[in-house]
Amino acid sequence: MVSSWPPRKCGIATFAEEAAEFIKKKDEQRPFYVVSHTDGEGDNVFPIIDMSRRDWYEPVAKKIQELDPYAVHIQHEYGLYNYVDENGDSDQNQGFLELLKRLGGLATIVEPHTVHGRLREHEENFVHEMTSLATVVLFKCHYQKWRLGWNFASRGWELPANIMIVPHGARPDKKYAIDEVAALEDELGLSYLKGKHVIGLVGWIQSNKRWDILTSIWEELHDRIKARTGEEWVLLAAGEMRDPNHTKDYVRYVNGIEHLAEKDIAYFHKFIPRGDPYYKVMAVCDLIVLPSLDETQSGTLARIIALNKPFVTTAPLEGLTAQTLESGGGLLFTNRDMLKKQILRLATDESMRWGLGYKLYRYLMEVVSWEVVAGQYYTAYHAAIEEKESGTPVYFEPEF
């Protein structure tokens, strides 16, 4: 696998680590290697992607060819392979394309994490060339494939036939029973939540994750929920910043939480949202709010699904909306008033919360469990290898 890798505070690194765990379980006899950026660590990890070099792809291609792999599974995000020269000019991921050219004799499977429904020109150009160089390309959502066909048609390009849909995986082994929550609260230092219902804002704190949308209306919502149910609900905002460019918004979001904390209706819990703690913090929540303004799919949503937590998220927003509709396990909002209504619906209707949670359980076990997704990865690997051996290009049916 080629990817960013822990301990980097990066959503792709976390994704790749989880994916690798289940890929290895699927075929425990086959060795698994990672070629990562220079900050990657771990067994069988080669940290040689040096983005300070224009030709970073040369040593990477050489190492991969030395390993002589069964297949090369590459995680792609534009920022991971963005070379910037001394004048501040980006190569627009041309180095990534050069890597694919040098791996042309191998079965390459590229998994891009950002494929917008409406592409910018440089994204169209990149995706067009990337799909022509990779053996198989894995999109997360069906809409990304049929929208790409529409986008490419305006340029006179055909929809690539090598695009397979494989959803963002979610762990099938992180569900917690209600009677385990009190112990989790003690373990996490969240004992002040005992006896209260909890709405969670959990994950990496970023500019696009608009926590302030909820904090600005929470006091009113808190009072309305209590008037209707007599129950005490609190807001738990939990996470940490990973990109210093988001410091201004981070401070603003946290200040909003601390203002509510003075009234004892909200709390801020600082932690690194990675590994077991990420799941455990979410597990103490009755429902999750995910107010994001720019995302094609979401690792946060994958964890919400893993825990079967009913949720409310922004729409229309690419993969968030698609998975909410496909799973049936969440509610959507387009403005503040709608957000208020959706939270009120969930907070005042326990049977609805249970119903949405069950739908998420079914969606998890049947569609997005890492055990299911790992099997789809191997289908992609076999298809890519078959193309290299037979010379017959892979073909996946268009969506419509």
Protein language model annotation of sequence segments:
Residues 326-337, 345-351:
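Conserved acidic donor-binding segment of nucleotide-sugar-dependent glycosyltransferases
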Residues 293-294:
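Aromatic "clamp/platform" in nucleotide-sugar-dependent glycosyltransferases that forms part
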Residues 191-209, 215-218, 236:
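Conserved donor-binding/catalytic core segment of Leloir-type glycosyltransferases
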Residues 132-182:
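Donor nucleotide-sugar binding/catalytic pocket of nucleotide-sugar-dependent glycosyltransferases
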Residues 310-315:
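Short hydrophobic beta-strand element within catalytic cores of glycosyltransferases
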Residues 10, 351-389, 400:
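A charged, aromatic-enriched C-terminal amphipathic alpha-helix characteristic of glycosyltransferases
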Residues 175-192, 253:
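A short helix/loop element that forms part of the nucleotide-sugar donor recognition site in Leloir-type
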Residues 239, 247-276, 327:
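Nucleotide-activated donor-binding/catalytic signature segment of Leloir-type glycosyltransferases, i.e.
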